[in-house]
UniProtKB/Swiss-Prot annotation:
Parts of the chain that traverse the membrane: none
SUPFAM superfamilies for this protein: Ribosomal protein S5 domain 2-like
Keyword Ribosomal protein found: yes
Family: Belongs to the universal ribosomal protein uS9 family.
The protein's name: Small ribosomal subunit protein uS9
MF-aspect GO terms: RNA binding; structural constituent of ribosome
Alphabetized UniProt keyword annotations: Ribonucleoprotein, Ribosomal protein
Pfam family, one: Ribosomal_S9
InterPro entries according to UniProt: Ribosomal_Su5_D2-typ_SF, Ribosomal_uS9, Ribosomal_uS9_bac/plastid, Ribosomal_uS9_CS, Ribsml_uS5_D2-typ_fold_subgr
GO cellular component terms given for this protein: cytosolic small ribosomal subunit
Gene Ontology BP term (one): translation
Alphabetized NCBIfam families for the sequence: PRK00132.1
Length: 130
C-alpha cells in the first residue's frame, strides 16, 4: 500500500515553498539538503518548526521542501506556511489551533516599490526651504 503523503504550498514575500509531509521521524529536507545545512540561522529553523509545536506533532513527519525565491527569512516563512497547510490535510481538527497561532494566514507584507524622484521607496533628498 502506498504511504500517505500530504502536500501544501506556502508563500512569503517573494518565496514559494512546495511542501510534502510523509509519516516518519521528523527529518526536514530543503532543496535536497538537510535543514541545518540549507538554513544557517537557528532562529529561522525554530520558525519552520512552529506548526509542529502548535499541533504537538514534532518528530511525527518527515518534511520534503522545494523552495525558491527570496532570502532566508522569506523562505523560512514560506516553509512554515506550507507545513501548516499540509498539516490541515493530515487532520482538519488542527485548523483551530493553527489559525489561533496565525500560521494559516498568508503574510501579505511585500517590499514597497521605489518611486521616481526619490532615492528609495520613501527616502527623499533633504528638504531646503530656501
Amino acid at each position: 500500500m502506498a504511504q500517505a503523503q500530504y502536500a501544501g504550498t506556502g508563500r512569503r514575500k517573494n518565496a514559494v515553498a512546495r511542501v510534502r509531509l510523509v509519516p516518519g521521524t521528523g527529518k526536514i529536507t530543503v532543496n535536497s539538503k538537510d535543514v541545518e545545512e540549507y538554513i544557517p540561522h537557528a532562529d529561522l529553523r525554530l520558525v519552520i518548526n512552529q506548526p509542529f509545536a502548535v499541533t504537538s506533532t514534532e518528530g511525527s513527519y518527515d518534511v520534503f521542501v522545494n523552495v525558491n525565491g527570496g532570502g532566508y527569512g522569506g523562505q523560512s516563512g514560506a516553509i512554515r506556511h506550507g507545513i501548516a497547510r499540509a498539516l490541515l490535510q493530515v487532520d482538519p481538527d488542527f485548523r483551530d489551533s493553527l489559525k489561533r497561532a496565525g500560521l494559516l494566514t498568508r503574510d501579505a507584507r511585500m517590499v514597497e516599490r521605489k518611486k521616481p524622484g526619490l532615492k528609495k521607496a520613501r527616502k527623499a533628498s533633504q528638504f531646503s526651504k530656501r
